[in-house]
């Protein structure tokens, strides 16, 4: 699949919204049960921009959004600066074509360029494809939490994975 990875713009928000709401309604990748509107995604976009965090999109030659990825603060406390939690979502009809790998690789490069130290992934434990993608790019499982969420009438387990972006870096 030939896709371009680039910074998202406001014009990409309808495509991002469609992918997000599909994940809400049909997967356990997002633990929300209520779809959001464009104003919600605009507020999210504005917050990421204000914080200096990227939103990347994979797009086809026509500019159509095929997937997106982003990261933000892991926790809102000063001691966690340098650690971010990320998300990668690919449109349903584009999964399995390597877009997740492209997006996550680009996100890792961006995090390293920003001087970040650790990227964290919080993945529903039954999502073997996402766990495999993260393992492929060097993430390791750092914890598991059984039955901490619920969706579609069942309990969800959470797997945490992390990637140390610069293992040789000294503590500040």
From Swiss-Prot:
For this protein, the record's InterPro entries field holds: Acyl_CoA_acyltransferase (IPR016181), GNAT_dom (IPR000182)
Alphabetical keyword list: Acyltransferase, Transferase
Question: What chemistry does it catalyse, as a reaction equation?
Answer: L-methionine sulfoximine + acetyl-CoA = N-acetyl-L-methionine sulfoximine + CoA + H(+); L-methionine sulfone + acetyl-CoA = N-acetyl-L-methionine sulfone + CoA + H(+)
EC no. given is 2.3.1.-
Q: Give the residues the record marks as binding substrate.
A: 75-77, 85-87
User: Which positions in this protein are listed as binding acetyl-CoA?
Assistant: 88-90, 96-101, 127
A GO molecular function term, named singly, is: acyltransferase activity, transferring groups other than amino-acyl groups
Q: Which SUPFAM superfamilies match?
A: Acyl-CoA N-acyltransferases (Nat)
Q: Where is the N-acetyltransferase domain?
A: 3-166
User: One Pfam family from the UniProt entry?
Assistant: Acetyltransf_1
List where this protein forms a coiled coil. none
Q: Which enzyme class, named as a word? A: transferase
Q: How does it assemble?
A: Homodimer.
What this chain does, per the record? Plays a role in the resistance against the toxic effects of L-methionine sulfoximine (MSX), a rare amino acid, which inhibits glutamine synthetase (GlnA). Catalyzes the acetylation of L-methionine sulfoximine (MSX).
Name recorded for this polypeptide: L-methionine sulfoximine/L-methionine sulfone acetyltransferase
Instruction: State the organism named in the record.
Output: Pseudomonas aeruginosa (strain ATCC 15692 / DSM 22644 / CIP 104116 / JCM 14847 / LMG 12228 / 1C / PRS 101 / PAO1)
Q: Quick one: which gene encodes this?
A: pitA
């Amino acid at each position: 699949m030939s896709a371009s990875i680039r910074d998202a713009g406001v014009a990409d928000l309808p495509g991002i919204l469609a992918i997000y709401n599909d994940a809400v309604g049909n997967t356990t990748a997002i633990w929300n049960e209520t779809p959001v509107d464009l104003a919600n995604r605009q507020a999210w976009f504005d917050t990421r921009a204000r914080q200096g965090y990227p939103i990347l999109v994979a797009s086809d030659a026509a500019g159509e959004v095929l997937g997106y990825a982003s990261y933000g603060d892991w926790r809102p406390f000063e001691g966690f600066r340098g650690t971010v939690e990320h998300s990668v979502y690919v449109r349903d009809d584009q999964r399995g074509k390597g877009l997740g790998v492209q997006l996550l690789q680009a996100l890792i490069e961006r995090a390293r360029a920003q001087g970040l130290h650790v990227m964290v992934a919080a993945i529903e434990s039954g999502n073997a494809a996402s766990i495999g993608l993260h393992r492929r790019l060097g993430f390791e499982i750092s914890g598991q939490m059984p039955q901490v969420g619920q969706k579609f009438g069942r309990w969800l387990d959470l797997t945490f994975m992390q990637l140390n972006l610069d293992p040789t870096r000294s503590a500040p």
